[in-house]
Amino acid sequence: MRGFFARAFQAGWGKKSMRGFRTDLAMECIDEGGGRVEGVRVSTHHMGGITHTRIRIEKERAAELLGRHTGEYITLEYRDLPRCDAHTQKLLAALVAQGVRSLLPREGEVLVVGLGNRNVTADALGTRVVERMLVTRHLRQAIARELRGRLRGVSAIAPGVLGLTGIETAELCRGLVRHVRPSAVIAIDALAAFESERICTTVQITDTGIEPGSGVGNHRLGLTEETLGVKVIAVGVPMVVYASTIARDAMAHLIDEYGLLARGHEEAAQQLLRQVSEGFLGDMVVTPRE
C-alpha cells in the first residue's frame, strides 16, 4: 500500500488491522503490525530474485496480537513465479526443501496430507501435490537393510473435504497417524492472502500446523501437534484473495498513480473505500484462472 491509500488505511477504514482481516500468511500479519512486533524475530535474505523471510513468534502475547500461533514461519516470495525460468524453479524448489527439512525431525517416517477439494482448481493444490509424489514407505521392506538408512519412509494421502466425505479431515488423519505412526505430518494446502500480489507468488512453511479453510472463514478442526499427537508442518501457496482487496488495490492505483483524488477529500475517499470493502463485495473470494 502506497501514498494516500496507506494513509487512508491507517486513518480508519482499515483499523481492524492484524485481527480484522483474514489471511493465512504470517508475513502479512507482521506487515500490518508495522513490521516490528515485540516477541517476534524476523530475518530476510535475497537470493536469485527470491525473497526468503524467516519469522519466529516467541511470545504468546505476540501470537495473540498477530492472530498466529507461536512457532516458525518461513516465507519464500518470487513475484514472477508463474513465468520463472528453469534455474529459478530449481532454486525455489531447493529452498522449499531446505525449509521443510529444517523443521522436520531428523529420524522417522513422514506422512504427507494433501488437503483440499480436487474438483475445485483453487483448492486442489494439496491433492495435486500428492498425485505427483514419490512415496517410499512400502519400498523400505523390499530393499537391502544396509540401504534403508538412506531412504526415509514417506506415505501420502488426499483425504478430500468434509462436504464430500462427511468426515473431518483431522479425524481421518488422527486415525492414520495412530496406525502409520509417523514422526511428523506434512500438510499441504491452498492458502488465502490479503494482498492480491501474493497470489501464486508466495510459499509459506510453518511448524505450527494448519486450520483448513480458516483463511476464508470456514473453520474446521485443525491439524496440529495437539490434535494429531505428532509434529505438523504446513506448506501452502496463496490461491485466493477477497474481491474487496482487488477493488481496494484498483482504487489505490488510480489514486496514487494518476492523482484522481484532490486534496481535502480524504474523508470521502475513506468512506468510499469502506463501502467497497465491507458493503458491496462482502466475503466474496476470487482466484486466478487455471
Model-flagged regions — what are they?
Residues 77-79, 109-120, 156-160:
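Short glycine-rich or small-residue beta-strand-to-loop segments that form or flank ligand, phosphate
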Residues 117-152, 156:
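Glycine-rich phosphate/diphosphate-binding loop of Rossmann-like nucleotide-binding domains
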Residues 115-123, 163, 190-194:
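Gly/Ser/Thr-rich loops at beta-strand to alpha-helix junctions
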Residues 177, 182-183:
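Proline-aspartate-enriched helix->loop->beta-strand connector
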Residues 157-158, 187-290:
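A structural signal for small-residue-enriched, beta-sheet-centric alpha/beta enzyme cores
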Residues 60-105:
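An N-terminal, well-structured beta->alpha segment
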Residues 4-70:
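N-terminal amphipathic/basic leader segments beginning at the initiator methionine
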Residues 147-176:
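A structural-propensity feature for long, helix-poor, extended segments
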